[in-house]
């Protein structure tokens, strides 16, 4: 693991803030657009979440990686049109985004964070693909 004091880690964390802004903007667009959301917007959100996940793995930020991975899985289903971004599902993704921001802001202690509740909510998102949560 590279120290979070490391310059490279600082750059990663700064990029995470940018990625999370992209995620939030895109999720809000999804909430408003639902199934009519532009494919490029979904791809942009997916890529931003993927970048957060991959960097977290590099820096051994296990909880950030785990949460980003679970959110990315839901986004992948939306991206492949296997899941409709209903308002309830998007709200779960927004909650995950908010929690990720908190973990990124306190990255030094993020591996001790309790993320079970939001992981469970994300796991339930695709449970019924034909109707809202």
What is the predicted role of each segment?
Residues 1-133:
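Non-catalytic helical tethers at domain boundaries
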């Amino acid at each position: 693991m590279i120290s979070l004091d490391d310059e490279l880690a600082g750059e990663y964390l700064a990029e995470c803030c940018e990625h999370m802004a992209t995620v939030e903007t895109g999720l809000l667009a999804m909430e408003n657009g639902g199934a009519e959301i532009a494919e490029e917007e979904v791809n942009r959100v997916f890529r931003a979440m993927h970048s957060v996940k991959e960097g977290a793995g590099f820096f051994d930020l296990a909880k950030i990686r785990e949460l980003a991975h679970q959110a990315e899985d839901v986004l992948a289903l939306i991206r492949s049109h296997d899941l409709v971004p209903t308002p309830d599902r998007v709200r779960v993704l927004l909650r995950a985004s908010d929690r990720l921001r908190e973990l990124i802001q306190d990255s030094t202690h993020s591996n001790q964070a309790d993320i079970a509740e939001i992981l469970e909510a994300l796991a339930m998102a695709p449970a019924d693909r034909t109707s809202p949560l």
